[in-house]
């Protein structure tokens, strides 16, 4: 027991002596110039002058590296809400077999293609958009990837068919798509066209830095690929119907696009100068709406 007690006292004495040793300061001493002391990033220079009191000058070295901003910024989950419509340039007298007319009834015409403006909705969901600085932050290249969802609600009871029995023909069949004036009244009658789309725009902004408030304007083009087309209808006689098929719509869509406003809310618009149908109808869509985006 005595040996254990003595050993404990010896260890405590050695530990106390070690703790009392003065810590070595983070200093650098220059014997040739003993009026200068460096402590980390602080340089202390002491100069003796003829004045009664010594003068001490402290020089602080700034080691902070300026932050480098990336020329590319990314915005995820951009959302558009607006309205779809189109300009009808169809020559109905030369539409051919795509339009089926009922014998004894007025011919299918432009009035049959009129839309319900308040219900024809355009929703765009951009998975991401990127902005590449070209001239400081005031001129940028904007591009991205997303989906365009267009819904055209018709006033008249028209129907689109991929193929099948031709109405009012006595049972004749066709493998070609067609549109006709139906015999029932629909409470809901829309043609939906959905696209994968890549926009490319030149952006001009007054904001000095990405994410800061400022006026912004962008103009450019977009390319879309049609991945879904369907005619959705509701009526008392037939109930709910969703007819998916190929209605002879163009697979690819080229559009002029633009946006205007102040972050995070701005206006957007698009116009397709060519028909979205391969033949028969000459329909040129346009959209307008509000975009919710960080920049």
Q: Residues of each region from the PLM?
A:
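Cleavable N-terminal export/targeting peptides
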Residues: 1-66
């Amino acid at each position: 027991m005595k040996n254990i007690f003595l050993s404990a006292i010896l260890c405590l004495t050695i530990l106390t002596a070690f703790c009392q040793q003065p810590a070595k300061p983070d200093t650098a001493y220059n014997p040739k110039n003993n009026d200068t002391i460096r402590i980390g990033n602080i340089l202390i220079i002491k100069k003796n002058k003829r004045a009664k009191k010594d003068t001490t000058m402290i020089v602080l070295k700034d080691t902070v590296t300026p932050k480098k901003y990336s020329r590319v910024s990314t915005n995820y989950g951009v959302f558009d809400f607006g309205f779809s419509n189109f300009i009808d340039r169809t020559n109905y007298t030369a539409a051919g077999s795509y339009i089926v007319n009922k014998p004894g009834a007025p011919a299918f015409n432009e009035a049959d293609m009129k839309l319900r403006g308040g219900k024809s909705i355009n929703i765009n969901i951009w998975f991401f958009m990127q902005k590449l600085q070209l001239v400081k932050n005031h001129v940028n290249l904007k591009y991205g990837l997303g989906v365009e969802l267009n819904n055209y609600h018709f006033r008249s009871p028209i129907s689109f068919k991929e193929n099948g029995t031709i109405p009012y023909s006595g049972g004749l069949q066709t493998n070609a798509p067609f549109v006709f004036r139906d015999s029932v009244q629909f409470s809901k009658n829309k043609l939906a066209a959905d696209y994968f789309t890549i926009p490319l725009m030149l952006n001009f902004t007054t904001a000095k830095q990405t994410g800061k408030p400022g006026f912004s304007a962008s103009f450019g083009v977009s390319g879309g690929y049609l991945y879904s087309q369907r005619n959705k209808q509701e009526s008392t006689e037939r109930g709910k119907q969703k007819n998916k098929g190929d209605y002879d719509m163009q697979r690819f869509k080229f559009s002029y696009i633009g946006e205007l406003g102040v972050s995070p809310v701005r206006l957007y618009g698009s116009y397709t100068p060519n028909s979205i149908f391969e033949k028969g109808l000459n329909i040129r869509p346009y959209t307008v709406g509000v975009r919710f985006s960080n920049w």
